[in-house]
A protein has these predicted regions:
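Bacterial N-terminal signal peptides that target proteins for export
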Residues: 9-19
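Acidic/His-rich structured neighborhood in mature extracellular/periplasmic domains
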Residues: 77-241, 253
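Acidic/histidine-rich, surface-exposed loop or edge segments in extracytoplasmic proteins
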Residues: 48-63, 121-129, 303-305, 321
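N-terminal amphipathic/basic-hydrophobic helices that include classical n-h-c signal peptides
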Residues: 1-11, 222
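Amphipathic alpha-helical packing elements
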Residues: 44-81
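Metalloprotease/metallohydrolase-associated module, dominated by Zn2+-dependent proteases
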Residues: 33-40, 47-55, 175, 182, ...
């Protein structure tokens, strides 16, 4: 007789944490708010109940060989992250979940029609963020429809992985194993980095920091395995991201200047000029990506862009050079780097932004 997934002691520990969170959210007001947190918690618990220990999956003769190989590599990467990168691995990535879709959650971003300031949702513990994650695409689309009805630009994007910041033992899943070996390992380092430092309401800081750990971690990982030349592929992806960011900065500069005229220009004029800027950006991206060997940050051209795409993209990529310079300033000593990042994170937002801008100006590749 076929039985369902067993509840392991690790799952029981996490289940007790979920019950605690359920008790906490009952103090929140509004049916929509409670419904949102309920889907988030039950969605994560759904992953946990389907998770199996990685060694068991590796030892199962019915597991495809490529999955076994990726999971064995993931165990090595966990050890490397703990011993060489000083990351707080704990019990993360010790279980595996096979998903029926390429993403684990989807994020919704909503931005007013004539603004680049996204709507912000506020959450317990992590503060306010410019996106809202859903385990159900249907739920995300329902919320998207509400914003569209109020004239917002919106974007829904699939997310390969997310971090619970150490609250739970995050599992591996098929979103990881679908990636190439290097990208899977890099993503593991990235998600573990969020456990080190996380500044509430500063997505740019958090994501730039995690990407810097991801990049240097991957460089050291490949070097240890005698595959240092493969780091060039990661740098090429970073270069594509930076080239796209340059285009986005130019477009957002034009849009910001346009939106400042919202009180003096007719809406039809604003829409026409906005669309001209976005169309130019899409065309510039198409031309830029023609020689790339894989899709860029916005995916394969042609692309349709709006305020929400731009607001999300520029949040994630701004200060990677600054954090990489800070790491180099500390001799690639990760514990010292983490302490410096924690100190930086305690500064007022404008001061830490200025510090990262100064660091970014000093950065040169291959230090």
């Amino acid at each position: 007789m076929e039985t369902g997934p067993s509840i392991t002691p690790r799952s029981m520990k996490q289940l007790s944490q979920i019950y605690l969170l359920l008790l906490l959210i009952t103090g929140l007001t509004g049916c929509t708010t409670i419904g949102y947190y309920t889907q988030a918690i039950t969605g994560h618990f759904g992953l946990m109940t389907r998770a199996e220990p990685v060694p068991k999956v590796i030892g199962n003769a019915e597991t495809p060989a490529d999955i076994r190989d990726k999971l064995a590599l993931a165990l090595e990467a966990r050890q490397f992250a703990r011993e060489q990168l000083a990351l707080p691995v704990e019990d993360a990535f010790l279980e595996y979940v096979q998903l029926e879709r390429p993403w684990v959650v989807v994020n919704l971003v909503a931005v007013p029609e004539f603004s680049l300031e996204p709507h912000r949702w506020c959450y317990p513990f992590v503060g306010c963020q410019a996106y809202r994650g859903y385990f159900s695409l249907e739920d995300a689309r329902e919320e998207q429809a509400r914003f569209r009805a109020n004239g917002y630009d919106t974007f829904i994007g699939g997310v390969t992985a997310y971090s619970t910041l150490g609250w739970f033992d995050d599992p591996l899943h098929s979103g990881f194993t679908r990636l190439s070996e290097d990208r899977m390992v890099a993503l593991m380092f990235h998600e573990l980095a969020h456990r080190v430092v996380y500044i509430a309401e500063d997505t740019t800081f958090n994501e730039s920091f995690a990407t810097s750990v991801e990049l240097e971690g991957l460089r050291q990982w490949l070097s240890q395995r005698g595959e240092a030349d493969r780091f060039d592929e990661a740098l090429a992806r970073l270069q594509r991201r930076n080239q796209t960011l340059d285009l986005v900065r130019a477009a957002t500069s034009g849009l910001e200047a346009l939106y400042q005229q919202s009180d003096s220009l007719a809406e039809d004029t604003l829409r026409a000029r906005k669309q001209a800027i976005l169309s130019r950006l899409a065309e510039d991206y198409r031309e830029l990506s023609e020689t790339w060997t894989e899709p860029g940050p916005f995916g394969p051209a042609p692309v349709t862009l709006n305020n929400a795409n731009l607001a999300l993209f520029r949040q994630y990529n701004q200060f990677v050079p600054g954090f990489r310079q800070l790491l180099a300033d500390h001799g690639n000593d990760f514990p010292a780097f983490y302490r410096a990042v924690e100190e930086l994170g305690q500064q007022p937002p404008d001061q830490r932004t200025a510090a990262l801008e100064r660091l970014s100006q000093r950065f040169e590749e291959n230090l």
